[in-house]
Amino acid sequence: TGSKIPESNSSWPQNGDEDLVCYELERTKKIFKKIRSVIGNIPFVLKIGYYENNNQLVKLAEIANEYADSISAINTLPGIIVDKNGNQALPGKNRVKGGVCGAPIKWAGIDMVRRLREIREKYNFSFAIDGVGGVIITEDYDEYINAGADAVLSATGAMWNPYLAQEIKQK
């Protein structure tokens, strides 16, 4: 595509009943090995979902350290989406789950950044950590940096406040 820093999102939560690709570690390794062989030395970001199991996260970090330059954590979290009356809010037959983003997932993003920082330090890994999830106000940026993020990204927060990055820079 010509991207200067491609990101491979292995964490999309709307895969039906299947697990996220990033939870299937052997599959993840094959995919990222292939990507690395195609892009050569171009910096590469691996986007992941939330890991409850720390042993699995360590194994993922080993894969990332070998094939990626950065881990972007996290993507949206799957959740049941209902309207104010408790009815299915998403269009489509039996489509009750969707990706939840914004402030409700910040705890998970901060947790992943802290754990990835600890893993990186313990195993002397070299990948960068991009903190994502629930960055709505400037203080959220500070929380991610203090947790160990090398960079902080915002999607939902930037949609609601297009000046968020400028406010963070001026702080």
Regions found by a protein language model. Name each.
Residues 37-49, 118-131:
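Short beta-strand/loop segments at the ligand-binding rim of alpha/beta enzyme cores
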Residues 70-80, 134-135, 141-168:
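Glycine-rich phosphate-binding active-site loops on the catalytic face of alpha/beta enzymes
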Residues 4-26, 60-125, 167:
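Glycine/Thr-rich beta-alpha phosphate-binding loop at enzyme active sites
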Residues 1, 47-49, 129-135, 154-156:
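Glycine-rich beta-strand-to-loop/alpha-helix junction loops that act as flexible
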Residues 1-59:
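Conserved beta-alpha-beta core of the PfkB/ribokinase-like small-molecule kinase fold
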Residues 52-66, 118-122, 135-152:
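Catalytic cores of alpha/beta
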